[in-house]
Amino acid sequence: LFKRHVGTVKAVDGVTLSVARGEVLGLVGESGCGKSTLARTILQLVPTTGGTVVLSGQNLTTSNTADILTARRDLQMVFQDPYASLNPRMTVFDTLAEPLLVHGVCSPADINARVATLMRTVGLAPRFMQKYPHEFSGGQRQRIAIARALALEPQVIIADEPVSALDVSIQAQILNLLAQLVRKMNLSLVFIAHDLSVVKHISDRIAVMYLGKIVELGRAADVIERPRLPCTRALVSAIPTPDPDIERTRQRIVLPGDPPSPINPPSGCSFHPRCPYARDICKATVPPLAPFATDRDVA
């Protein structure tokens, strides 16, 4: 009755990405840049207004509900908060058995053995399968979430900031587990984070997002060691250095102002209000993501 139109938000705008089997693609950017929306769009949890999502030749954006459900066997997600992503009323056994039963990939007689195998894969003892989420630590809960994502043996896993809610010591364990699973199972992993210090340890390539667009894409080492855009340089400068003497003397890049509103984005390059190198052309022209060097794209 009182609904009114206040504007249109392009949370993800013109993004083109591909992920190969066995590859880890790191997706980084400031909070609110569209990383999580992109992840949900890939999974078709959020409807697309344009473009396509293709998984092994199948266009998910034009598929019906039944086909999307079938495709999700090959496309799974690990959410950010292990305290919210697990049903508190379901035991670990129920949580891991549910996708197996829904998709009919395992007979009831084999469910117990399959759940035990999944728990061992992520470093948990099968004797805990009748426990509830509140009986586990944050790191253990995230291992359960990873096991649930692995239950259907997917081709692609999207991990949306899977370690940001965990202690630093636990973060390393989860990162090592994900890297081990990628190698062992030949998974494709899209690893989303806002912290480049985390992403650089696990990614083969890194894509940098700003206000819904991919602005820099390349091999992880190249992006970290030779960032081309000011927004990427600012993210790299925020990576802490273990040596306190170096940390005290190194220059930290702080971008002026706040990210523009996606409801009313600036004209031209969306970064120009905060860019120290902005010129008049930046206010009028949207820079396309284009090849800059071998295996490197820059907007």
Where are each of the predicted segments found?
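ABC transporter nucleotide-binding domains
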Residues: 1-226, 237, 297
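Charged, flexible cofactor/metal-binding loops and thiol motifs
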Residues: 1-5, 219-299
